[in-house]
């Protein structure tokens, strides 16, 4: 039975137009692949693409919340167009191991597809974008290369927070949105609810909403005809001067830095001399091509196409995503919307036990070549030695980077607690008329409030606008959580009779301290979260320092709101005590703000039995030995140093 079942399933994927037999627990679907297109490669593929006019180009992406089936749907579309073999590697466009393990998309990927519709060839460019808020800048750049998007909604979960956020981002860029309800094969699928939410939340008509199952392939063949008929083609012009948008970049051992670009206008080919509008640097184009699904070299890239360019760049610092490439001596205007990505979370990275500094530096540089959004500067800690201060787009971004460091390079590191960029506003001095604003991303640089109190006008912390969707029965617990994290309610709307959309303004510092985990606990896993930057707000900030025998352990210092300091101080000293070894003198652990001690724990000294070999009747010798031991302990208490092992830092930081 099972052998026959597997054979019938394989047959359904291989096509062309083979239907799976009707079985009691299988949906019936067909996957039609044009064998002529599936067999194309090399010069034949390039000639076929060259014959397609720009009017028959369609560039589109998929808008969805995390885990709503975006990568699986991409697989089905690639199989449908013959780009990849049916039943092959899952989540094909998720290239990184960490993406497949976590089931998320981290790096935007693109793939070119050929599709025959009503007897004519169409050139389709699919951009698979991340769904998580940490990668919002990458999503925005990817949308800029598209004319429309599939608005994907999970039938079992309905509209979620990141669905809403990504919808409004796509809507603001004037993308045509096609609603698609996925996972309709699940027993818990609630299609009417999803329909109602699409209509009420996004004000989109539900007459032509596609209902599909990306997992089984059910109705997936209806998607591309709808894309062709409803999403407009690019409006670029071949005869206009070259303008190409840099969407992403990665490093290749042979070509150097490779750019993923969207050619807005004009034509670019090997030998074309281009200039970066942002940096002013000039380059000769070494190679151009498309992703089908891997790199396929072509003679040229034309207006409306998404492909790669190799310019001979040696460092990723030369490639600025969102920048415009134009021909040398051209007067073409740059494409709008360029903005450098700004890190929002900073951590200290130091070599772990047995890790060589030079080897770790090489590993970090290799990873940052493929991730332009990561910033890296050298830093020194008295406790941990030489290391780096690194900036990330968010806590997930930092966590993914750490996983890649371990998986791809076997590098074990110590990562300090995340910090956000605070601002110190100083009063004008002398002839100055405006306050001086200093941004601080390292707690070690936080000013001494006792010494500089007169100079400081205010301390400010970054804020975020949070959007949460949750079942109505959890409103009370989630609102209590937001208020406990210094949140301010902005809005509350009902998506339908059971789902609520909450909007709060919350300090970013509270968000990076496992707010998402607490939100899941408060809603029993049913809530979803999205956020975006929302300026700065004046706040009562302090730096909490950890001291061991009077010496500040700089790697553990954190900036926080004054209301959190006492509770955090007590937790810190109790936890850190469990990671330190005993000594022959008292080890005093303190948490303090300035000179004010908020909490203290003591690891009592262990005594050596100096009387072990002494005769019981020798009282004078006994007294002398005890006196000498006491004097020695007093000297150790004064001059002795506590060497904190790196395992203690790793253990403590992993639990804070």
From Swiss-Prot:
What species was this sequence derived from? Yarrowia lipolytica (strain CLIB 122 / E 150)
| Keywords recorded for this protein, A-Z | GTP-binding, Hydrolase, Membrane, Mitochondrion, Mitochondrion inner membrane, Nucleotide-binding, Protein biosynthesis, Transit peptide
Q: Could you tell me which SUPFAM superfamilies the record lists for this protein? A: EF-G C-terminal domain-like, P-loop containing nucleoside triphosphate hydrolases, Translation proteins
What's its catalytic activity? GTP + H2O = GDP + phosphate + H(+)
Under the heading Pfam families, the entry gives: EFG_C, GTP_EFTU, GTP_EFTU_D2, LepA_C
| Location in or out of the cell | Mitochondrion inner membrane
Q: Which domain of life is it from?
A: Eukaryota
Role this protein plays = Promotes mitochondrial protein synthesis. May act as a fidelity factor of the translation reaction, by catalyzing a one-codon backward translocation of tRNAs on improperly translocated ribosomes. Binds to mitochondrial ribosomes in a GTP-dependent manner.
Matching entries from PROSITE patterns are given as: G_TR_1 (PS00301), G_TR_2 (PS51722)
UniProt keyword DNA-binding, yes or no = no
What residue stretch is labeled transit peptide in the record? Answer: 1-28
Domain tr-type G positions: 55-235
Name recorded for this polypeptide: Translation factor GUF1, mitochondrial
Disulphide bridges? none
Name the gene for this chain: GUF1
């Amino acid at each position: 039975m099972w052998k026959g079942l597997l054979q019938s399933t394989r047959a359904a994927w291989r096509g062309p137009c083979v239907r799976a037999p009707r079985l009691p627990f299988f949906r019936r679907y067909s996957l039609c692949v044009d064998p002529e297109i599936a067999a194309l490669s090399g010069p034949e593929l390039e000639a076929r693409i060259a014959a397609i006019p720009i009017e028959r180009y369609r560039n589109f992406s998929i808008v969805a919340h995390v885990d709503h089936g975006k990568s699986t749907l991409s697989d089905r579309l690639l199989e449908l167009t013959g780009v990849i073999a049916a039943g092959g590697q899952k989540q094909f466009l998720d290239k990184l191991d960490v993406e497949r393990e976590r089931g998320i998309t981290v790096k935007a990927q693109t793939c070119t597809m050929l599709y025959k519709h009503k007897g004519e060839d169409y050139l389709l460019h699919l951009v698979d974008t991340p769904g998580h808020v940490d990668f919002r800048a990458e999503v925005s750049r990817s949308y800029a290369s598209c004319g429309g998007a599939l608005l994907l909604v999970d039938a079992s979960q309905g509209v979620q927070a990141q669905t809403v956020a990504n919808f409004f981002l796509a809507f603001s860029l004037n993308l045509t949105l096609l609603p698609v309800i996925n996972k309709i094969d699940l027993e818990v699928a609630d299609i009417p609810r999803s329909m109602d939410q699409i209509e009420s939340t996004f004000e989109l008509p539900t007459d032509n909403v596609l209902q599909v199952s990306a997992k089984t392939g059910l109705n997936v063949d209806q998607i591309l005809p709808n894309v062709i008929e409803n999403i407009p083609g690019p409006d670029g012009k071949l005869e206009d001067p070259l303008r190409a948008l840099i969407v992403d970049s990665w490093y290749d051992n042979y070509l150097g830095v490779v750019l993923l670009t969207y050619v807005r206008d004009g034509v670019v080919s090997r030998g074309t001399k281009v200039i970066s509008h942002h940096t002013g640097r000039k380059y000769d184009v070494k190679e151009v091509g498309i992703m089908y699904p891997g790199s396929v070299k072509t003679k040229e890239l034309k207006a409306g196409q998404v492909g790669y360019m190799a310019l001979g760049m040696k460092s990723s610092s030369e490639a600025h995503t969102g920048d415009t490439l134009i021909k040398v001596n051209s007067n073409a205007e740059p494409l709008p919307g360029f903005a450098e990505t700004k890190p929002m979370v900073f951590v200290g990275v130091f070599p772990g036990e047995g890790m060589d500094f030079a080897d770790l530096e090489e590993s970090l540089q290799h990873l940052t070549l493929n991730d332009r959004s990561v910033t890296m500067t050298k830093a020194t800690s008295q406790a941990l030695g030489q290391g780096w201060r690194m900036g990330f787009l968010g806590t997930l971004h930092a966590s993914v980077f750490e996983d890649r460091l371990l998986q791809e390079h076997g590098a074990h590191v110590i990562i300090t607690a995340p910090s956000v960029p605070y601002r110190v506003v100083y009063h004008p001095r002398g002839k100055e008329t405006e306050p001086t604003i200093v941004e601080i991303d390292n707690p070690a640089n936080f000013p001494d409030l006792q010494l500089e109190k007169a100079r400081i006008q205010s301390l400010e912390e970054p804020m975020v606008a949070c959007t949460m969707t949750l079942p109505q029965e959890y409103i009370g617990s989630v609102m209590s959580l937001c208020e406990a994290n210094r949140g301010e309610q902005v809005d509350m709307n009902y998506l339908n009779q059971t789902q609520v959309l909450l909007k709060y303004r919350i300090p970013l510092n509270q968000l990076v301290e496992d707010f998402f985990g607490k939100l899941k606990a408060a809603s029993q896993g049913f809530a979803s979260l999205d956020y975006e930057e929302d300026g700065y707000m004046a706040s009562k900030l302090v730096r909490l320092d950890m001291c061991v025998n009077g010496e500040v352990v700089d790697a553990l210092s954190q900036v926080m709101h004054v209301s959190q300091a006492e509770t955090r101080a007590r937790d810190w000293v109790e936890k850190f005590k469990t990671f330190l070894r005993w000594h022959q003198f008292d080890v005093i652990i303190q948490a303090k703000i300035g000179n004010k001690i908020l909490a203290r724990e003591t690891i009592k000294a262990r005594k050596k039995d100096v009387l072990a070999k002494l005769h019981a009747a020798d009282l004078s010798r006994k007294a002398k030995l005890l006196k000498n031991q006491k004097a020695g302990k007093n000297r150790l208490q004064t001059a002795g140093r506590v060497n904190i092992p790196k395992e203690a830092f790793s253990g403590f930081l992993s639990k804070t």
